[in-house]
Amino acid sequence: MNKRSLGSTNFEVSEIGFGAWQIGADWGVEVPTDTALESLSAAADAGVNFIDTADVYGAGRSEKIIGEFIQGRDDEIIVATKMGRATSDWNDSYDEISKAAELSCKRLGVESLDLVQLHCI
């Protein structure tokens, strides 16, 4: 799998990433957790080290599954998460962003987030 530098970061990410919207099961058929973990493992085995998710995917379910997957390998996998749509009263204040980041860290089981994107802002 080819890798590229991610902007001005020190991250080397795979040219193909794993989009984790569906494992959150907002719409369509719910993906069982074991199937989601198998899919993430298959992607990692193929060289994918970049996962894209959001706090709103399955009301945090996607982040929780990814958190389970990256335990013990979080230095190998780069996770990009999005925030800004989980509540209808979202604002882009420091407090709101800090709270959303803290909740994402908790679901992912990490101390800090690799990459944060503001969702539909």
Residue ranges and their predicted role:
Residues 1-77:
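N-terminal binding-site loop/beta-alpha segment at the start of enzyme catalytic domains
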Residues 19, 78-81, 110, 115-116:
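Non-cysteine beta-strand/loop elements that form the S-adenosyl-L-methionine
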Residues 21-23, 54-56, 82-86, 118-121:
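Active-site beta-loop-alpha junctions enriched in small/polar residues
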Residues 22-34, 83-98:
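Active-site mouth loops of central-metabolism enzymes
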Residues 65, 69, 82, 96-103:
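Generic beta-strand or strand-like secondary-structure segments
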Residues 88-121:
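Glycine/proline-rich, positively charged
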